[in-house]
Amino acid sequence: MKSLHANLLRFGVLVSCLALPALKASAQTDADALMIPKNMFCAAAVYDHSSWNDYWEGTFKRNNLNIGTLSANSYMFMGNYGITNKLDFLFTVPYITTNASAGTLHGQRGFQDLTLTLKWLPFQTEIGKGVFTAHAILSGSLPLSNYDPSFLPVSIGLGSTTISLRGLLNYQVGRFFVAGAAQYIERQNIDINQNAYFTTHEIYSNNVFMPNMNNVLVSAGYRSLKLNVEAIVQQTTTLGGFDITKNNMPFPSNTMNSTTAGGLIKYSFGAVSGLELTAGGNYVLRGRNVGQTTDFFGGVLYVFDFSKNHR
């Protein structure tokens, strides 16, 4: 069983450095059970394209000829550093562009939100033929630019500073694993560029109350030293908010619920140590006040070894 522990640590180098933004159904490092070893750093550049034609106005699914197809392109730089074998530090910096294919809405572009994460492995034990681990993940995010969060659906973000805590359980037997996680996200209020707005009633202020959120996910897949294949289903729920009113635009404090299914595949090159490629996609199965989004992503990752014993 000691060899299994060693292999899991090696898998951490190869797999755990991919970190897409929160709420993506992908092999995010804040949502998987892999740790990068001490003094190793994984750098990643990832491109993501998402689009939708239909969206839910409350629970009513519809399209909007004044929007057409809403698309977004995300260019992300991410890093993951092993402080110890049981504590990782991660960051994500995304640059986002949006576009509506119809109507008069002008697409937006700019840096979105910086996300910083600490990922801790406090518990690990052998159960049967596998290894069971428990993780605690603390994350925070804040806007990197002065974008307009109220210009939905083409805004590049919601403009809220957040802090979140995720608990994750994972069980791996050989090269196969299953995992589950739950996350609570606290969001600060935001200011918008107008002095009054309507939710369920008229509010004379530029300050918007942002309801908190939670997220639960289950994942399963296959991991080896060269190949990683993973499937993920997750549910995101807003703890409050209100529905988009008929024929109106979305608002930052809307209830935004979604059930998403996704998957990824990642390959590590034996000929070039540390070089990896990844690709995957996600689809919103059902939602409330969100678009029925399809997205695809691809990226390049490279692992640097800064350990003193590296030769």
Regions found by a protein language model. Name each.
Residues 45-47, 77-81, 91, 116-120, ...:
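Residues on the lipid-exposed face of transmembrane beta-strands in outer-membrane beta-barrel proteins
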Residues 49-74, 153-155:
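Surface-exposed strand-loop-strand hairpins of Gram-negative outer-membrane beta-barrel proteins
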Residues 47-53, 93-99, 122, 140-146, ...:
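Transmembrane beta-strands of outer-membrane beta-barrel pores
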Residues 39, 71-75, 109-114, 132, ...:
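Residues that define the transmembrane beta-barrel architecture of outer-membrane proteins
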Residues 56-58, 63-65, 202-311:
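Outer membrane beta-barrel transmembrane domains
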Residues 31-39, 86, 124-133, 175, ...:
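Short loop/turn motifs that connect adjacent beta-strands in outer-membrane beta-barrel proteins
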Residues 42-46, 88-90, 117, 133-137, ...:
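Residue-level detector of the transmembrane beta-barrel scaffold of outer-membrane proteins
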Residues 104-208, 253:
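Outer-membrane pore/translocation modules
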